[in-house]
A protein has these predicted regions:
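Auxiliary N-terminal substrate/complex-recognition segments of SAM-dependent methyltransferases
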Residues: 1-202
Length: 202
């Protein structure tokens, strides 16, 4: 059993052949989320993976109501083992936005962002953690298209992207969907820069 310690949290990862191991992108999103989240908030993490970011929030903030979604069954089990309430589904599917309890103050997403051709796909469930389609933005664009319906008035999203993903392209998409987009965290790592973009409903 692989475990990671991060501040107050010890994360159980299980089989890393099937579950993405938290790395610099996960840590940067967790740091940004800790600054944005407040007690009493309703928070949704989409594509929670091992549950790392959600577990960090639960360990550090009182009285938050947190739900997560995850498509990978191995990762969903891992998130549950880390104390996260998780629904196994694709993005928002199955969450009905017309119900008040399914509107959130803050929605988090660390999408797969590597530009990936058919020949570059990884076998098995782990592909969902990396494969951003040809542009690297395919899953992110689906998320952005749907996110507004799940936010409370004045709600915010935090998305982790890479310089590979194209910051200006992402900001333009967010603007076209009614979000004010601001960079709130960034970190240079190896061949890329990791960036957290906050989108606030206008």
């Amino acid at each position: 059993m692989v475990e990671i310690e991060y501040g107050k949290v010890r994360i159980k990862l299980g089989d890393t052949a099937h579950v993405y191991e938290p790395a610099e992108d996960s840590f940067l999103l967790a740091d940004a989320a800790l600054k944005e989240a407040k007690p009493g908030m309703r928070i949704l993490e989409v594509g929670a993976g091992s549950g790392f970011v959600s577990a960090v929030l639960l360990a550090n903030l009182k009285d938050i109501h947190l739900l997560a979604t995850e498509i990978n069954p191995h990762a969903a089990r891992c998130a549950k083992a880390n104390g996260v309430e998780v629904i196994r589904t694709d993005l928002f599917r199955g969450i009905k936005p017309e119900k008040p309890e399914n509107r959130f103050d803050l929605i988090l997403f660390n999408p797969p962002y590597l530009p990936t051709s058919k020949e570059e796909k990884v076998p098995g469930w782990l592909n969902y953690a990396f494969d951003g389609g040809i542009s690297g933005r395919e899953t992110l664009e689906r998320f952005l298209d749907e996110a507004r319906a799940y936010l409370k008035p004045g709600g915010k999203i935090l998305v982790l992207i890479s310089s590979i993903t194209g910051l200006e392209a992402v900001k333009e998409i967010m603007k076209s969907l009614g979000f004010k987009a601001d960079v709130v965290e960034r970190k240079k790592v190896s061949f890329e820069e990791l960036i957290v973009v906050r989108g606030k409903l206008l």
